[in-house]
């Protein structure tokens, strides 16, 4: 089982999103919830926008909390992140197992029932994402190397979510990714972030989802021409499980009251 968290947007102490959202407190509550799950995830993947401004100090703060997870965790970049600062803080840890000399932060995780490929869609200085030829070649090589069931994690969705302001800053070259994946039937799912909402769809014939943020969410408004708005809907994370027959994803929102058995 994989716990996916995304869009943490952690800032320095005392710095709140829009003057209201303590994103570090939201991350702490999320991590506590994951540690308390009755079914222990094998790993946690933080799928981008870990920091809000990409400073080393923010990543040190994030690491101080993620290090308290009781299972291994991995980090990926989003459009708010800095590769250099992530390498500085996570580069010598299992959380960022990139190869020496590798420009982009991409890597594979081997689990007993599943292979996970984490992609780097960061396009420096832009809100939208991109997969350059080097990153696509890396993915092609990884998919050619193994026929095991494989799940892809990437920050920017390659598909529309229906919110115009977010669709304008999705992955910029989804057709290149779709064309590559068409030759690999062992890719059983895609998991994304970026949108700050839970979304489920099928893209290029593959089940795909978007993870909510543990902090603020993007307001659900599908009308064209409307500005992006944020909302204090409950934050959450996703739990992905896979067996011989299916990939299943659950949305975990919180905090919630303790479960009470039926009488």
Give the residues covered by each predicted segment.
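N-terminal active-site segment of His-dependent metallophosphoesterases
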Residues: 1-61, 104, 161
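Active-site environment of divalent metal-dependent phosphoester hydrolases
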Residues: 11-13, 52-57, 79-87, 124-127, ...
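Short glycine-enriched, charge-decorated loop/helix-capping segments at active-site entrances
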Residues: 16-21, 163-170, 224-226
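His/acidic metal-ligating clusters that form di-metal
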Residues: 29-43, 128-209, 231, 238-239, ...
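A cross-domain feature marking catalytic cores of carbohydrate-active enzymes
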Residues: 48, 77-79, 121, 154-156, ...
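Extended active-site neighborhood of metal-dependent phosphoesterases/phosphodiesterases
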Residues: 55-140, 176, 182-183, 204, ...
């Amino acid at each position: 089982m994989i716990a996916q968290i995304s869009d943490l947007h952690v800032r320095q102490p005392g710095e709140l999103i829009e003057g209201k959202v303590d994103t570090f407190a939201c991350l702490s509550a999320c991590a506590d919830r994951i540690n308390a799950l009755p079914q222990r995830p094998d790993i946690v993947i933080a799928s981008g926008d870990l920091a809000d401004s990409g400073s080393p100090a923010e990543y040190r703060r994030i690491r101080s909390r993620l290090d308290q997870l009781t299972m291994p965790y991995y980090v990926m970049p989003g459009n708010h992140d800095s590769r250099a600062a992530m390498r500085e803080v996570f580069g010598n840890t299992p959380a960022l197992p990139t190869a020496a000399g590798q420009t982009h932060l991409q890597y594979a995780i081997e689990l007993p029932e599943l292979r996970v490929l984490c992609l780097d869609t960061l396009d420096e200085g832009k809100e939208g994402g991109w997969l350059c030829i080097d990153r696509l070649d890396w993915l092609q090589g990884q998919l050619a190397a193994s026929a095991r069931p494989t799940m892809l994690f990437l920050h920017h969705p390659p598909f529309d979510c229906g919110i115009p302001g977010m669709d304008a800053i999705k992955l910029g070259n989804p057709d290149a990714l779709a064309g590559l994946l068409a030759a690999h039937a062992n890719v059983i799912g895609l998991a994304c972030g970026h949108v700050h909402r839970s979304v489920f769809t099928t893209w290029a014939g593959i089940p795909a989802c978007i993870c909510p943020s543990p902090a603020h969410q993007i307001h659900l408004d599908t009308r064209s021409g409307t500005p992006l708005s944020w909302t204090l809907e409950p934050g959450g994370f996703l739990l992905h499980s896979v067996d011989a027959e299916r990939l299943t994803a659950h949305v975990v929102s919180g905090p919630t009251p303790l479960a009470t058995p039926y009488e």
